[in-house]
Amino acid sequence: MNHVFTFLEQRLMPPLNKVANLRFIRAIMQAGVITVPFTIVGSIFLIINNLPQIIPPLASFFEQTILKFSPLYSVATTMSIGSIALFYCLATAYYLTDIYRKEEKLQLSSFVGAILGLFAFLMTIIQVDISDSGAQLLQTTGETAIIYNGVALGSWVTRFSGVGIFIGILTAVLATQVYRFCVKKKITIQMPAGVPDGVSKAFASLIPAIIIAFLMILINGCLAVFHTDLHGLLSKPFEFVKDLTGSWLGIIVIMLLIHLLWAVGVHGTAVIKNSFINPILLVALTENIDGATNIFAGDFVNMYIFIGGAGSTLGLVLLMLFRAKSQ
């Protein structure tokens, strides 16, 4: 056993500690924590919608009372879980900008960084196709969803939900890097000393915003030539990763890695779950709302693996409560 711990400490801890200390990883971890309240709020109203399945004997009662107002209160689910990519993008860009501001002593505004990240993400929402006749906004009609003026619509803007989380993170990091580069190299509009700080920061973001706009137009245009976009380009590899992590073998490997890190003094939950797994869980949860049956989604981990703490320590806690004695 000592050989195992020695191997983990010497071979596994150093690279994982380096990964955990990467600035964008730290920003994603913080973004994952800050978005938790929105998933909880959305889940509460989602449970209300499923009361007939939870308590079948009272199904007719719920249908005649609470569920009559479902279109009203379901807005809370749509605007929380259904918009989770927006929150992830804003939070990631905000915290990453804040990290650069503090660690590199740059004159950055975390709020401006968040807005630039959101701007970059929104530019990936519209679907455009380029042919011999030029560029056109996609228009399609399906049974469950449509694309109107380039925007995929279900009950809400589809790409604002879990399916857009990774693009939201990617564009947040990209926009923050552009903002940081412009400020670091002084490629900004400098205002006189007497101008209020808020106005000065607003004009300082103008050139980064222009660069981000041209950059996203270039990326969208290049991909539209091949009849795809960022979401379409990354959907296949991400779907493979989601399916892999959602398998029983994937779950076992992930949880084993988390607890091995705990065993050698590294916060395994923060390094593995909060940074990499939470976005995947949110995507799976969003799919479940639409009728999918992903097991590894939402609070599955907390209910069946982390109950009482990492390692399902509820039994140990109860044992300590009733059997432990003070020395």
Spell out what each predicted region is.
Residues 9, 13, 18, 24, ...:
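Loop-helix junctions at membrane interfaces
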Residues 278-327:
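Helix-loop-helix junctions within the multi-pass membrane cores of secondary transporters/permeases
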Residues 112-120, 272-281:
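Central hydrophobic cores of alpha-helical transmembrane segments
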Residues 107-111, 268-273, 299-302, 327:
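The feature identifies polytopic integral membrane transport proteins across all domains of life
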Residues 1-39, 59-263:
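Signature of multi-pass transmembrane helix bundles
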Residues 265-274, 309-313:
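Transmembrane helix boundary and interhelical junction motifs in multipass membrane proteins
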Residues 256-270, 320-321:
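Transmembrane alpha-helix interface/packing and boundary motifs in multi-pass membrane proteins
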Residues 40-56, 220-225, 285:
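Juxtamembrane "helix exit" motif at the C-terminal ends of alpha-helical transmembrane segments
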